[in-house]
Amino acid sequence: MIKSNLIDLLKTFGYPVKLQGTLTKEEAYPESFFTIWNNETLDGNHYDDEPISYIWDFTIYFYSTDPALVNTKIVDAKNLLKQNGWVVAGKGYDVPSDEPTHTGRAIDVLYKENN
């Protein structure tokens, strides 16, 4: 599955990968970690009135206690994903963190799945 592929790629950096919003208030934030969110999965191309591909749209977040790492790791993730067939535009954007000790950055990525 596409989501599993994305998680496996991000895990190669050695940081935990979680679904966005799944850390509980009681759970301590890891020092650095990725989260992902599937924004939508739309039909791509069609043939004979049926979809023959799908476009997966994800947001990837990286949070860390090290602001410099936040800026570099999201670009590293972008480069890895592009090498593996993902479409990634730009260098990302800042995102808020629920913990004052962490800063975050995110990128939006697309993947075309062919049937």
Label every model-predicted segment.
Residues 1-47, 73, 99:
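Small/polar-rich, solvent-exposed N-terminal microdomains that initiate assembly or binding
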Residues 44-51, 113-115:
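Short, basic, helix/turn surface patches
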Residues 45-49, 61-66, 87-91:
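Short, surface-exposed, polar/charged, turn-prone segments marking secondary-structure boundaries
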Residues 49-53, 75-78:
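Short intrinsically disordered coil segments
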Residues 52-65, 102-113:
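Oligomerization/assembly interface segments of phage tail-like spikes and tubes
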Residues 67-73:
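Short, conserved charged micro-motifs
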Residues 75-115:
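Acidic-leaning, charged glycine-interspersed low-complexity segments
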